Amino acid sequence: MIKPVQTELYAVIGNPVAHSLSPVMMNAAFRSMNVPATYLALQADELPEDLETLARFGFRGLSVTLPHKELAYRLADHVDDMARTIGAVNTLMREGSAWIGCNTDWLGATKALRRVTELEGREALILGAGGAARAVAFGMKREGARVTIANRCVEKGKALAKSFRCDFIPLAILDRARFDRHFDVVVQCTSVGLQGTIPTVLVSDSFFEPGMVVMETVYRPLRTPFLNAAKRAGATIVHGTDMLVYQGVAQLEWWLSRPIPEFPCVAAMKQAIHEVLSKEKNAQDD
C-alpha cells in the first residue's frame, strides 16, 4: 500500500530572500543525513501575520534574515538567554502552539573568525547596528575582543554600543584622512554589497591594512567590493559563506536535537554552496 512520506517543513524568511543560499545548503544537509525535510525560501513582508500563516501550514523551523531579526525576537513566545542578551533572533522553532527563538549568528561569526585568528584582546570593529551586528558584537565580546561599533545612524549605533558596553564611532569618521586608530578585526554587518542592491561604498580603500582580518556577512556575491578592497590591501579575508555554514550547523543541531557531523553533513553544505557560486562565476566570466 502506498503511504505518504511525512516531510517536515523549514524555511528562511526575510525580504529580500531570493538571493539566499540557505535552501541549497540546508536541503543538502537534510539529504546527507537522510532526514525527511524540505527547506524553502519565503519572502516575508508582514512578520506577525506571516508567522501565524507558517504555523498553520505546519512549519517546524525558520531561519530569519534581514530585516526581521529584531522583530522576530519581539514576536517570539519564548527566547533563550543568549537571544535575550543579543535582542535579536535568527532562528525559530515551533513547539506546540508557540514559536521559540534563539540566535546562532554569533556562533557562526566567532567560529568563522577563530579559524584564522584569535579574538581575545583584539581590537575589533563592527560596521552596522542591526540584528547581525548585535549578534556579532555579543560573540566578539564573549571571546574577549575589545569591540567598537561604527554606524551611519549615530543614534542606533550608540544604542547598540551602550547595550554591549562598546565604543562607538560614526561611520563617516573612518574615511577621514587623519583617522589613525588601528583595528585587528573588522566585520561588515550591513546589507551593503548584497546582490541586487545599489552599490555603496562603506569605507575607502585606504582604511584597510596588511594583517587585518576582514569578514563579510554578505555572501552573495562571494567577493563583495568590500572584501576585494581588503584583499588588495593585504588583509586576510573571511567570506560570508563561512558564517552562513556555521550558523546553519547550529540551527540544525537545535532543530534536530542531535550533533551535526563534519562528514558527510557539513561537507555537503559547503559543497552545495560552492557549486552554486562556481556556476554563477562561470556565467559571469562567459
Curated annotation (Swiss-Prot):
InterPro entries: Aminoacid_DH-like_N_sf, NAD(P)-bd_dom_sf, SDH_C, Shikimate_DH, Shikimate_DH-bd_N, Shikimate_DH_fam, Shikm_DH/Glu-tRNA_Rdtase. GO terms for molecular function: NADP binding; shikimate 3-dehydrogenase (NADP+) activity. It catalyses: shikimate + NADP(+) = 3-dehydroshikimate + NADPH + H(+). Signal peptide: none annotated. Pathway: Metabolic intermediate biosynthesis; chorismate biosynthesis; chorismate from D-erythrose 4-phosphate and phosphoenolpyruvate: step 4/7. The active site is at K69 (proton acceptor). It comes from the Bacteria. Pfam families: SDH_C, Shikimate_DH, Shikimate_dh_N. Shikimate binds at S20, L21, S22, T65, N90, D105, Y219. Its EC number is 1.1.1.25. Keywords: Amino-acid biosynthesis, Aromatic amino acid biosynthesis, NADP, Oxidoreductase. NADP(+) binds at D81, G128, A129, G130, G131, A132, T217, G240. GO terms for biological process: amino acid biosynthetic process; aromatic amino acid family biosynthetic process; chorismate biosynthetic process; shikimate metabolic process. Homodimer. NCBIfam families: aroE. Belongs to the shikimate dehydrogenase family. PANTHER family: BIFUNCTIONAL 3-DEHYDROQUINATE DEHYDRATASE_SHIKIMATE DEHYDROGENASE, CHLOROPLASTIC, SHIKIMATE DEHYDROGENASE. Involved in the biosynthesis of the chorismate, which leads to the biosynthesis of aromatic amino acids. Catalyzes the reversible NADPH linked reduction of 3-dehydroshikimate (DHSA) to yield shikimate (SA). This is Shikimate dehydrogenase (NADP(+)). It comes from Syntrophobacter fumaroxidans (strain DSM 10017 / MPOB).
